[in-house]
Amino acid sequence: MIKKCRICKGNLELILDLGKQPLANNLCKNKSERKKLYELKFCACKKCGTYQHNINISLDDLYSQYFYSSSVSKDLNDNALSFSEEIKKKYKNKSIKILEVGSNDGYLLKYLKDEFFCLGIDPSNNMTKISRSYGIKTLKDFFNAHSSKFIKNNFGNFDL
């Protein structure tokens, strides 16, 4: 459990206690199917005001099978479609390259891939597979110094 602010090491104040919760969208009808639950408490730093949850979840636990798919949200899809139309209008007849970090299931890039070179990067196995099924070039990795160097060496610079 986190006792001090991740940013400034100030004291944390409990704002909201949600009790034991599964990871994002990992909801099960039967208790026997239930995966690991986490004590989820939201805190605010008394010093810098940053809001944060009180636990560190291993990246493997969080992303090996990620359960939140952006495409299931009508609002997110509508927003992605509207945003992609703005990009298409602004960069019409231009050859640009688009990189989306945390591309999830490709919900944004699927609207742009036919007009522009698009690359997604996401650490989740299942979201990467979905994105690739749309024909989107997607790297399964975290975005960090190593992956950014790989991207630059293999794909060059990106415009967006």
Model features per residue range: what roles?
Residues 94-104:
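Conserved class I S-adenosyl-L-methionine
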Residues 117-122:
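Conserved SAM-binding motif I beta-strand of class I
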Residues 149-160:
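A short acidic, Gly/Pro-enriched loop at the edge of an enzyme's catalytic core
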Residues 1-75:
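N-terminal juxtadomain amphipathic helix
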Residues 135-150:
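Conserved SAM-binding strand-loop segment of SAM-dependent methyltransferases
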Residues 105-115:
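Conserved SAM-binding loop of SAM-dependent methyltransferases across substrates and taxa
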Residues 124-126:
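Conserved SAM/SAH-binding beta-strand->alpha-helix loop
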Residues 78-94:
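Conserved alpha-helix/loop element of class I SAM-dependent methyltransferases that forms part
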